């Protein structure tokens, strides 16, 4: 794999709450120069990013970020608005507390609601795996697949329990493999 191939696998991300318009414009310029797959910005910056990306760079955003503690309808509305403003991808955060409680029907319903709201866009679902047991990770992956997610992701990078680790990635791969 060469540098350009690797760059095409990267979402150049800016999700810090203090980000400004000029930060987003600079992010878009960097992404074009580096040849990344996308820029990932907060929903309030989707229109600005869409107007400033070039060189085939896509726009990604988040919903329910970073806590996942938004009602499914709010997540779906946020995602739908972002897609209408130019987002090609949406990274949604599950309500990890519901996963910990084993409320799998709720989890599947919230992912399904966002999936329906993002027709034509990629839907990536963030699980916060550091807060989950192995069994919960596997079950969450299965329910995300059933709900129509395109990808599952380990972590937001903002959760106090931590981020991605080999254990979680292995479980995710064993559960959904190359399907998600």
What are these regions (language model features)?
Residues 1-34, 44-180:
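Alpha/beta enzyme core
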Residues 38-41:
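Short, hydrophobic beta-strand segments that form beta-sheet elements in well-ordered domains
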């Amino acid at each position: 794999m060469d540098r350009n191939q690797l760059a095409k696998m990267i979402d150049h991300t800016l999700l810090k709450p203090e980000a400004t318009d000029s930060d987003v414009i600079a992010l878009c310029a960097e992404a074009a120069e580096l040849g990344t797959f996308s820029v990932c910005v907060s929903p309030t910056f989707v229109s600005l990013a869409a107007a400033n990306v070039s060189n085939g760079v896509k726009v990604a955003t988040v919903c329910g970020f970073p806590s996942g503690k938004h009602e499914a309808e709010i997540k779906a509305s946020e995602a739908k608005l972002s897609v209408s403003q130019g987002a090609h991808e949406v990274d949604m955060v599950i309500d990890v507390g519901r996963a910990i409680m084993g409320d799998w029907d709720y989890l599947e319903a919230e992912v399904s609601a966002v999936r329906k709201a993002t027709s034509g866009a990629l839907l990536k679902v963030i699980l916060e795996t550091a807060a989950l047991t192995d069994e919960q990770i596997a079950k969450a992956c299965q329910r995300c697949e059933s709900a129509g997610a395109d990808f599952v992701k380990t972590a937001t990078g903002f959760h106090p329990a931590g981020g991605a680790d080999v254990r979680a990635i292995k479980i995710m791969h064993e559960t959904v493999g190359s399907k998600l």
